[in-house]
Amino acid sequence: MLEFKRAFNAQTKFHSTVHEEFWAILAQHLLSQLDLPLDRARVYIGPGQSLQGLYFHPESPEQAFGTQLGNTIKPKFKDRDFMIALKTDFNLTLNHHRAPLKTSGSIPELFLPLVTIECKQYIDKTMMDNALSAATKLKAFSPFTLDIVTIELNKLSDVNIAGSGLDGFYILRKQKLSEARFRNGDGPKDTVDVARRNPLDNEVILKVYEAMKNHIESNRWHCDEEAFFEQGFVTNGL
């Protein structure tokens, strides 16, 4: 088994982890407990590509100025390790012309995310910067999506999510990556010795669960004028 452990680093799928599947199980339980009129056929739980934006991309001046304007609107997708999303058909009509929006992988529905989780065994500065940038872009298109990162081990010397679109950052094992590496350098750089990892922390897992629950149950996604006058304030989903 040691030969296999040497062959893959901590970010591969070959190490012992059920990170994404774990959140899917909790999300299924969460939705079953909610007192909401859910159409379960429209709810998607798991990894996938969520809609992140639409952009104008004509292939020629004739297409841009002609009658086929709908063909110039392209969807942009983002890979998600885990999400709770709404499945929906998406039809766009421009100048009485239906835009044939093609989804990634020929999937017939679009996924509109309510919750997204970036799942990592560990995270370094470059990966963290990418996560912060992706969160900011997501919030520009979908401001009411809860976007969080969960990691098992930490490689960062400084953790700061201020100014980004990221809503939360959770470390499930409360342990540094350096503390879980092979002692004698038996594997590649940053290879994790699973026997040295801390167990998953129940309190942190509960925090993630509560964050998802509070977000989905929130009644402050929208505030009409009457409610605004009655309560005297509106917050950004907090």
Which residues make up each language-model segment?
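C-terminal tail/extension regions appended to the core domain(s) of diverse proteins
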Residues: 1-17, 24, 28-45, 51-58, ...
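Phosphate/oxyanion-binding active-site loops and adjacent basic polyanion-contact surfaces
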Residues: 15-23, 75-79, 124-127
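Active-site metal-binding core of divalent-cation-utilizing nuclease and nuclease-like domains
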Residues: 46-107
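Conserved catalytic cores of phosphodiester-cleaving nucleases, focusing on short active-site segments
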Residues: 82, 113-121, 131
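Short, flexible loop/turn elements at secondary-structure junctions
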Residues: 86-88, 120-123
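Active-site-adjacent loop/helix micro-motif of nuclease/hydrolase catalytic cores
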Residues: 92-96, 122-133
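Short His-Asn-centered micro-motif
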Residues: 117-122, 149-153
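A contiguous pocket-lining binding segment that forms or flanks enzyme active sites
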Residues: 129-147
